[in-house]
C-alpha cells in the first residue's frame, strides 16, 4: 500500500504531466489556427521551439539510457572478471 507521501508525489507528477500535455497540445495544435495578433500568443514560445524542445528532451533521454546501459555493462564485466 502506498504511503501518503507516495500518493502526494504521484498526484504531483500526474498534475505536472497534465499541465505540460495541455500546454503543448494547445501550443502545437490550436495556436496555428488563432490569429497571430491575439493575446494568447504572448503566453507561448515561438513555434520553432515546438520541435526543438521535444527533440532535445529525446536526445537527453537517449543519452542517459545509453550511459546507464554502458554503466551496467561495465559493472557486469568487472564482477565477471573478479569471479574468474
Curated annotation (Swiss-Prot):
Q: Which UniProt keywords apply?
A: Endoplasmic reticulum, Membrane, Transmembrane, Transmembrane helix
Q: Which domain of life is it from?
A: Eukaryota
Query: How is this protein annotated for GO cellular component?
Result: dolichol-phosphate-mannose synthase complex; endoplasmic reticulum; glycosylphosphatidylinositol-N-acetylglucosaminyltransferase (GPI-GnT) complex; membrane
Grouped into one coarse class, the protein's main location is endoplasmic reticulum
Matches recorded under InterPro entries = DPM2 (IPR009914)
The entry sums up its family as follows: Belongs to the DPM2 family.
SUBUNIT field? Component of the dolichol-phosphate mannose (DPM) synthase complex composed of DPM1, DPM2 and DPM3; in the complex interacts directly with DPM3. Component of the glycosylphosphatidylinositol-N-acetylglucosaminyltransferase (GPI-GnT) complex composed at least by PIGA, PIGC, PIGH, PIGP, PIGQ, PIGY and DPM2. Interacts with PIGA, PIGC and PIGQ.
Function according to Swiss-Prot or TrEMBL? Regulates the biosynthesis of dolichol phosphate-mannose. Regulatory subunit of the dolichol-phosphate mannose (DPM) synthase complex; essential for the ER localization and stable expression of DPM1. Part of the glycosylphosphatidylinositol-N-acetylglucosaminyltransferase (GPI-GnT) complex that catalyzes the transfer of N-acetylglucosamine from UDP-N-acetylglucosamine to phosphatidylinositol and participates in the first step of GPI biosynthesis. May act by regulating the GPI-GNT complex.
- UniProt name for this protein: Dolichol phosphate-mannose biosynthesis regulatory protein
Q: Which gene encodes it?
A: Dpm2
Amino acid at each position: 500500500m502506498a504511503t501518503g507521501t507516495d500518493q502526494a508525489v504521484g498526484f504531483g507528477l500526474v498534475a505536472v504531466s497534465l499541465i505540460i500535455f495541455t500546454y503543448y497540445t494547445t501550443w502545437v495544435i490550436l495556436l496555428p489556427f488563432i490569429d497571430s495578433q491575439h493575446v494568447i500568443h504572448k503566453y507561448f514560445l515561438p513555434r520553432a521551439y515546438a520541435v526543438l524542445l521535444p527533440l532535445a528532451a529525446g536526445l537527453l533521454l537517449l543519452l542517459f539510457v545509453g550511459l546507464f546501459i554502458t554503466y551496467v555493462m561495465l559493472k557486469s564485466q568487472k564482477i565477471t572478471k573478479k569471479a574468474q
